[in-house]
């Protein structure tokens, strides 16, 4: 979450008349995150989250995201629910941006994960995958392998010295992944961004999953590989086998991986590291001036990419 677009109090009050969530008491921007502008709303009926969808999010995709959250919520996945307007619509417009209000989830995201958090994430990710099997809508992954090359070219336009540090390795990785990326694996809805700041906990128990705005149809095992990147490294860039084993075993108690997935998981983790390296690089150079947003360090994913590109066996991942 972040704030790229500010809103005027009078415009917000007028927008809220479309809902039955009480009168506005106060609101504040949420700094954490990258993609959209987010605000905490305090009304006479409680707390809510207002999201203004910025340029990377297509308005055409919003029904997919909102209906997916509804679908998952009905199947017991703890995620925010879109608040319906009085006219029955989920999406409105505010400050020239598509906008929606979702319910507020209790809990906090953890800055330093432990084995219990990783086990909870593994279990919940598998439950999410299974709960979405009968979801009727679909969406292409707009940040899949085919898109990484274009993203890298857009980064290189900047001619920044930082890019010279990454350049040769990224070119090599892109070529390798294009040559070896799997074409047939179990597929369904994936979250695609299940990082620690998108998962809430209460007393080490998972209480909510948020930010479904990268959700799409892709390999389930790729979603798991993203979680290995997001949850199983320490601040010194070392890979924590205990956390990884807990995450993987908890996932497989709900949905065991098939042999094809096991054979591909190292490659998928390598690809996931490259994906987040590239998006962080792009955002590092292209965050608009004046945005209230904390930019995320690309170097973190450089180290992860180097780790996964040198993994030689499943045991090194925690299997």
From Swiss-Prot:
EC number(s) stated in the UniProt entry for this protein: 2.7.1.39
Enzyme's top EC category: transferase
Recorded metabolic or biological pathway in which this protein acts: Amino-acid biosynthesis; L-threonine biosynthesis; L-threonine from L-aspartate: step 4/5
Listed GO MF terms: ATP binding; homoserine kinase activity
Pfam families for this protein: APH
PANTHER family given in the database record: AMINOGLYCOSIDE PHOSPHOTRANSFERASE DOMAIN-CONTAINING PROTEIN (PTHR21064:SF6), AMINOGLYCOSIDE PHOSPHOTRANSFERASE DOMAIN-CONTAINING PROTEIN-RELATED (PTHR21064)
Species for this entry: Bartonella henselae (strain ATCC 49882 / DSM 28221 / CCUG 30454 / Houston 1)
Protein family per UniProt: Belongs to the pseudomonas-type ThrB family.
One GO biological process term: threonine biosynthetic process
Reactions the enzyme catalyzes: L-homoserine + ATP = O-phospho-L-homoserine + ADP + H(+)
Protein name, as recorded: Homoserine kinase
Keywords assigned by UniProt, alphabetized: Amino-acid biosynthesis, ATP-binding, Kinase, Nucleotide-binding, Threonine biosynthesis, Transferase
